[in-house]
């Protein structure tokens, strides 16, 4: 009973190292998110300009942008269909609202998985393309 330190307290460094290894991809964006002055907003024409100017990362970014359409479509279909089903059988507004939210999340996830296989995103490094775009935008906006 002399050592009253908790399990988490004893193993804090190990847990911190474990999770920092698994979440290390967040460090790719740190220099863009933790700035003194934020980057200015960009438009679709800026993204199209980057896609045209970078032969390596441009097509990857274009494919990643196309994948968003799958996610949005899946979210809309999932949200509306589950909310309609819940409303039809329960007539409960809060149940329909929760079904709408849950169906939207499920639909987005399912849509992204469809995009992953259809557009073969698993073969591309979309994060590197996004980081290259952010670097390009940072240089261009200075």
Curated annotation (Swiss-Prot):
Mode of membrane association: Peripheral membrane protein
Pathway the protein acts in: Carbohydrate metabolism; tricarboxylic acid cycle
Keywords noted in UniProt: Acetylation, Membrane, Mitochondrion, Mitochondrion inner membrane, Tricarboxylic acid cycle
Localisation: Mitochondrion inner membrane
Disulfide bonds: none
A GO molecular-function annotation: protein-membrane adaptor activity
Biological processes annotated in GO: tricarboxylic acid cycle
One GO term describing the cellular component: respiratory chain complex II (succinate dehydrogenase)
Modified residues (N-acetylglycine): 2
Highest taxon of the lineage: Eukaryota
Predominant subcellular localization, coarse grouping: mitochondrion
UniProt keyword Acetylation present: yes
Subunit composition and interactions: Component of complex II composed of eight subunits in plants: four classical SDH subunits SDH1, SDH2, SDH3 and SDH4 (a flavoprotein (FP), an iron-sulfur protein (IP), and a cytochrome b composed of a large and a small subunit.), as well as four subunits unknown in mitochondria from bacteria and heterotrophic eukaryotes.
PANTHER family named in the record: SUCCINATE DEHYDROGENASE SUBUNIT 6, MITOCHONDRIAL (PTHR36708:SF1)
Protein name: Succinate dehydrogenase subunit 6, mitochondrial
Organism (species): Arabidopsis thaliana (Mouse-ear cress)
């Amino acid at each position: 009973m002399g050592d009253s330190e908790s399990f988490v307290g004893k193993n804090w460094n190990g847990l911190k190292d474990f999770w920092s290894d698994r979440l290390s991809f967040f460090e790719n964006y740190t220099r863009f998110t933790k700035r003194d002055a934020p980057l200015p907003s960009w438009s679709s024409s800026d993204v199209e300009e980057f896609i045209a100017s970078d032969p390596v990362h441009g097509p990857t970014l274009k494919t990643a942008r196309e994948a968003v359409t799958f996610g949005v479509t899946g979210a809309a279909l999932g949200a509306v269909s589950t909310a309609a089903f819940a409303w039809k059988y329960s007539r409960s507004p809060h149940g329909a609202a929760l079904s709408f939210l849950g169906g939207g999340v499920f639909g987005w996830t399912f849509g992204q998985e469809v995009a992953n296989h259809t557009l073969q995103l698993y073969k591309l490094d979309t994060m590197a393309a996004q980081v290259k775009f952010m670097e390009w935008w940072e240089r261009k906006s200075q």
